[in-house]
Each structure stands twice: as structure tokens, then as C-alpha cells.
Curated annotation (Swiss-Prot):
Belongs to the RNA methyltransferase RlmH family. PANTHER family: METHYLTRANSFERASE, RIBOSOMAL RNA LARGE SUBUNIT METHYLTRANSFERASE H. Keywords: Cytoplasm, Methyltransferase, rRNA processing, S-adenosyl-L-methionine, Transferase. The lineage of its organism: Bacteria, Bacillati, Cyanobacteriota, Cyanophyceae, Synechococcales. GO terms for molecular function: rRNA (pseudouridine-N3-)-methyltransferase activity. This is Ribosomal RNA large subunit methyltransferase H. It comes from Synechococcus sp. (strain CC9902). It is an enzyme of class 2 (transferase).
Length: 144
């Protein structure tokens, strides 16, 4: 996984300082990975903002409760399959993503069968991206 070929689009702001610090920690470890915050609104307006921010050459990965749930090693392997593509991970607002955006996604991903606040999901995603990179590169961060 090449962090400079990945980005995260997330609806809403991170309001908890400790979550923001965690996100910043992993972003420093993944140079090139960016997070773009989109304004909270109605699901339809959020979907319009997301679509406007998407680039034609990106593979859309929608984070959603009903998505595919993988362990860290299978997640790393799956990301490796996309290594030559530009990836955009999308985290919707409190009401999630619209049905149209979910269908537009090339991969529907769930971070867990549990439900988490969206700002915490953002932290979990950047940590898992770092973990996936360490698994693929054979670095000792992941201990299983």
C-alpha cells in the first residue's frame, strides 16, 4: 500500500482532542496519506459533496456497517491487490452513506461488527492502514 496513492474523505469534524492526536500520529507514519473533512449536512448533500470531491481515477472504498469485515492480515492482502490504484476511503456522516454512493463503491468495508462514532472510525482506519503497510513490508508493528 502506497500512502501517497490513498486519501480519506470524512464527513464531519473530529471534536475530541485525543482522537485528533491519534490520527495525526498515524498520518506522520504514513506520509502522503491525507484526510479531507466534508461538512455535516443531510445525507443527500453529503453525497453531493463526496461525489464532487471524488477524482475519476480513484477506487472508491465505502466504510459502512454492512460492508466486508476483515482481520488485519486479510485487510493488508486486500489492499495489496489495489497497490497500483489510487484509493479513496469514504466515511459518511451520522446517517451513513446514501444507497447510490454505496453502490458506486468498488469495495464496501466495515471496520468491525460493532458501531463506533465516526471520528473514532477515522482513527481506527488510519491505524489499520499503518498496520497493513507494516504487514506487507514485514515490519514488526503487527504482532499476531
Amino acid at each position: 500500500m502506497n500512502p501517497s496513492r490513498c486519501r480519506i474523505l470524512a464527513v464531519g469534524k473530529v471534536r475530541r482532542d485525543w482522537i485528533q492526536k491519534g490520527i495525526e500520529l498515524y498520518l506522520k507514519r504514513l506520509p502522503g496519506l491525507t484526510v479531507t473533512e466534508l461538512r455535516d449536512s443531510s445525507p443527500e448533500k453529503e453525497a453531493d459533496s463526496i461525489r464532487a470531491a471524488l477524482r475519476p481515477d480513484e477506487t472508491l472504498i465505502a466504510l459502512m456497517e454492512q460492508g466486508e469485515c476483515l482481520g488485519s492480515i486479510p485487510f493488508a492482502r486486500r489492499l495489496k491487490q489495489f497497490e497500483n490504484e489510487r484509493l479513496v476511503f469514504v466515511i459518511g456522516g451520522a446517517d451513513g452513506l446514501t444507497a447510490e454512493l454505496k453502490l458506486q463503491a468498488q469495495w464496501q468495508l466495515s471496520l468491525s461488527p460493532l458501531t463506533f462514532p465516526h471520528e473514532l472510525a477515522r482513527l481506527m482506519l488510519v491505524e489499520q492502514l499503518f498496520r497493513a503497510q507494516s504487514i506487507v513490508q514485514g515490519r514488526p508493528y503487527h504482532r499476531a
